[in-house]
């Protein structure tokens, strides 16, 4: 029963994240000479939006999610391995870094850089020729975007280590055996003013983080993410999933995320108070009414998100109860 449950959950995970199976292994081939020619041409220096797409292997995705979840409320950090094909960045693998994280930031010390250099040297000895292509870190409970510190880190790396990608994962908002909350970003060159773009997809950001988000949101852009796997990945993916599945079954988002849930409700309360204050002081013009509707719409979306997350947490508990407790009752 547990094997069937794990297999079904893995299929659900692949469907929710739209992981595509590739029929050939061309994507895994690496041509060092061609890559060096690409680096020398530096097409990204002529177009700040040159890189538009990211392809992430299912193994790299699952390793990042497992690492992010292991950090709990603390931020974690790791590296991305891969290559570039035209305007697409392909992430083949990822590995964790030994860093000191807090609830709001993650700092890489000398030991982490030494570990990274040694890891990259050893992995090339095994025949893996992919290069470091970026970094990832977690934002537990407050969404996928770049803070001021993140923008600074990404900008420095793009200046000296191009091509370079930044990925953010929110393990708290990632639904067990469901869609991964993830974002891939690149910063603009200093002094560059991006064109006015249409409204991006709304995401809930805590009131305490909105200022940091708003100040820096025009300094970077997001890339479209897709996922892939090959037939060669399946065995390793199954083993990784079994470990992830055990952790999922042995934990409950309702209990493990109690502080996050409380924070969400408090944040929603503060946003409602803020909306009420602004509504009471606003004039009855058409422009003010549009602002009021936008503000109330965002609060409504945040409220719906909190409700959906709680329902999903309850459903996961019901699912676990039907697997274990009812099976034991039937046997007795």
From Swiss-Prot:
Keywords: Cytoplasm, Hydrolase, Metal-binding, Metalloprotease, Nucleus, Protease, Signalosome, Zinc
Database matches in PROSITE patterns: MPN
Alphabetized InterPro entries for the sequence: CSN5_C, JAMM/MPN+_dom, JAMM_MPN+_peptidase_M67A, MPN
BP GO terms, sorted: asexual reproduction; proteolysis; regulation of cell cycle
Single GO molecular function: metal ion binding
Domain of life: Eukaryota
Compartment(s) of residence: Cytoplasm; Nucleus
Residue span, MPN domain: 54-191
Role description: Probable protease subunit of the COP9 signalosome complex (CSN), a complex involved in various cellular and developmental processes. The CSN complex is an essential regulator of the ubiquitin (Ubl) conjugation pathway by mediating the deneddylation of the cullin subunits of E3 ligasew complexes, leading to modify the Ubl ligase activity. In the complex, it probably acts as the catalytic center that mediates the cleavage of Nedd8 from cullins. Csn5 is essential for growth or survival.
Domain notes: The JAMM motif is essential for the protease activity of the CSN complex resulting in deneddylation of cullins. It constitutes the catalytic center of the complex.
Name recorded for this polypeptide: COP9 signalosome complex subunit 5
